[in-house]
Amino acid sequence: MQKISKKHKLALMLLFGLLTLAAKSNTMYFQTIRGTIVDQDSKTPIVGANIIIMASDPIMGTSSDAEGNFRIEKVPVGRVNLQVSCLGFENKYIPNLVVGSGKEVVIQVEMTELVVKLGDINVVATKNKEESLNEMATVSAKVFTVEETKRYAGTFNDPARMVSSFAGVTNNAEGNNDIVVRGNSPKGILWRLEGIEIPNPNHFAGEGSSGGPINALNSAMLSNSDFFSGAFAPEYGNAYSGVFDMQLRTGNNEKREYTFSAGALGIDFTLEGPFKRGKTGSYLINYRYSSLGILDDLGLVDFYGVPKYQDVSFHVVLPTRNLGSFSVFGLGGKSGILQKDYSDDSESYVTRQGDFQTGLGVVGVNHTYLLTDHAFIKNTLAIAGTQSKGIYQMRDSLGNFFDANIDDFVNTSVKIAVTYSNKINAQHRIKAGLIYTDLGYDIFSKYDVIGNGNYTQSQDSRGRAGLVQGFVNWKYRLYQDLTFVSGIHYLNFLKNQSQSVEPRLGIDYQLGAGKVLSMGIGVHSKVEGISTYDAKVKHDDGTYSSPNKDLGLAKASHFVIGYKHQITEQMYLKAEAYYQYLYNVAVENSPASPYVLNNEQQGWSDRELINKGKGRNYGLELTVERFYYNNFYFLVTGSLFDSRFTAFDGVERNSAFNGKFASNFLIGKEFRIGDKSKNRTLGVNAKITYFGGNPYTPLDLQASLDENNGVYDMAQYLELQGDNVFKADFSISYRRDREKSTHELKLDVQNVTNHQSKVYEYYDQGSHSIESGYQWSIFPNVIYTIQF
């Protein structure tokens, strides 16, 4: 209770400080908005596009030049909305550009060519904010902006936490940013950066996981990106749950700019600018170092140790006159924590301790070359690696420490990808690609929870394996109102020759003004982690075998139908119904076992597995959103779903992520403070989340005592349900523009009411008892940011 009161006290002090900031200012400041207008399909510049700032008086605007570039100067600071129009193209609406005096606004706008039949006149269409950046997506796609990631309460500038506001998506109640989509395991998520698959981009990420407590990729580096929750376009493979397709923004290529942030989670610095004045090349670099130790010292958090992490990311863009455009991107992170658990009788006596270290790195090169005005080719080479290692120590009967668990997992990859895109005309576009991944691994794990020196060796292998993927997309716009996207994805895991041929189809039909009916179907599959294929199974006679080397691919067929209604220019309604049939799912090779690998959130299994499982997910999702307009927005999402698996024993049970329902309500408003200069803004945002608790398996106390380790009662596999989870997040921010800088102070509090729902139970090896695990408690984060 003492820690909780300290958190509340700090939050109230920070809130009071925000509300009492400020001297008046009568000076109005201005900034430049500039960018490039290109064809969405061919990526060629659009000449003569008209760009206006909506509701400006007098009207402010300009037109794009021969290279598609535009510039609007002397734009007053604040929020603005852009309208982009060009003869022969759909209008493009770009809302909520935050114009600050400390940083230019640089954007790239992609426009879609109109399909006009002979005799048609006065065709007008507008692409809105919620539509996917990927023109091949017809259903279950949502674009997320960096501005939303920063604005939504409780996100901590983490895009993985931000997408939990979308219908059908929830995060881990225990504090991690694991993404559960439509009842599927977070392991089914695909992370992509700059068009290429990357490993889990989170700090403190365990083997086989897709999430973590802190994202290593700072949102200050991101451009608008896509998130997909089902029936993915043909170019996406090696995923059955969801796809996070992230794009890095391009640094300012005309002037140097700097951003500094300091908060409870970390201190970071971003710099960007041109390599040479008058040239079009640019760089963007961000470095961050953790500051959680401060909160730990204040007693505001208790991790049984101080988490330490640092990360760096960069994006270098080098256009050339005749050889196309080159870009180099990278992400690196290092994290670790030394945890100690002390005796209840003595605060100086350590009963157990663990040292957990992780690292990740990605470096890639993209080369895009325009073959014609309608076709381009993109080549990518990327190298990536991750390591997670840990030593967990306990005391034996004599009070001496022994190594109870030792892990060391190293995974590397080299990826080569080639993508060809051809916009044949306004109706037809073809996109095809080939991806080869060379996987390297050196993995080791052993455990002995009793301390007798008799270790169980569950992992000990090293080697290489290949993964081949290919795809073909065809987009056919039969009419302006009717679009078909068809294609096929192919995947072959060369380690055991498991392969999958995956047809995909999407349809988008505009019923009338602002009304769209869409449909998507497709087959999807995913390769398990190498640690699952090479896991060693210990037999009763003490011998080992590796029975999972020939394990096949887990597969899923997705069926989605959606309806979208643009109620007003600023509000829309979206509904989707879906059914997913999962098959070829890995389950324990025992007719009496209920075990299903897809119920795991991370890690691997040292059981003998076979592809005899199946499952089904179905549900209904509803979204009502009022875009940010006139300093106000709200978002309401709701999901009803059911997620079940059938193991080798033939019994259908809840999946481990079958919470059955999820809902979100987000609301926010900005207030101009003081005079008409609009240089000072107070923002207030809130988010309320309520979702069903996940099923869990109870522990067998006597068996756990005998093994000195948590032993689950498999006779009650996933039969208990965790408490429903209520979580309220709140943020308040104060932004002030000065002549050449923008300052912002923000307080962001997760679980402001400190609700404590029971999420799971675990065996405590120190107290030899079964304990309950609860949702993440209140967590305040204060952030100061300056742009100059």
Question: Across the structure, where does each feature detected by a protein language model lie?
Answer:
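Surface-exposed extracellular loop regions of Gram-negative outer-membrane beta-barrel proteins
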Residues: 201-202, 336, 387, 445-449, ...
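Gram-negative outer-membrane beta-barrel transporters
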Residues: 579-581, 601-693
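C-terminal beta-signal and adjacent terminal beta-strands/loops
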Residues: 634, 677, 687-711, 723-729, ...
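Outer membrane beta-barrel strand-and-loop segments of large Gram-negative receptors
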Residues: 409, 413-417, 458-471, 548, ...
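Flexible loop and strand-edge segments within Gram-negative outer membrane beta-barrel domains
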Residues: 303, 324-370, 377-378, 385-412, ...
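Transmembrane beta-barrel wall of Gram-negative outer-membrane proteins
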Residues: 263-289, 302-336, 355-383, 424-432
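Periplasmic N-terminal accessory/gating domains of Gram-negative outer-membrane beta-barrel systems
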Residues: 98-106, 124-232, 243, 249
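Periplasm-facing N-terminal accessory domains of Gram-negative outer-membrane beta-barrel systems
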Residues: 24-120, 126
